[in-house]
Amino acid sequence: MQKFLVLYMAPARVLEEWMKLDESVRKNQEVEMKAGWDAWMQANGSMLTGMTAGAGKTRRVTSAGAEDVKNDVMMFSIIEAESQDAAATAFQNHPHFGIPEGWIDIMPAHVLSRMS
């Protein structure tokens, strides 16, 4: 089994627009999304290594200093799968795609021997 970093992405502007919706509309959408997540987890949850988290506000650090920025990362997971293609297949019908313009990036997680 190989480890992969999964990034659940959506344009920041889409999320900002979603937050402007009436709270009852958002809550209904959240209930639908949770049901989709529960179903997906039932079928594919064994891939997850136990690390899934939402991404908070971004502080970018460069050689020139640090600043607050917006990016499109909503959440991340660490998963195990036989291959990157197998991981991609499992995520093809993920409920994250209920978010307009949402996408999922899956990349190999290479452990750096001196960093672990």
Regions found by a protein language model. Give the residues of each.
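Conserved, structured core segments of small domains
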Residues: 1-116
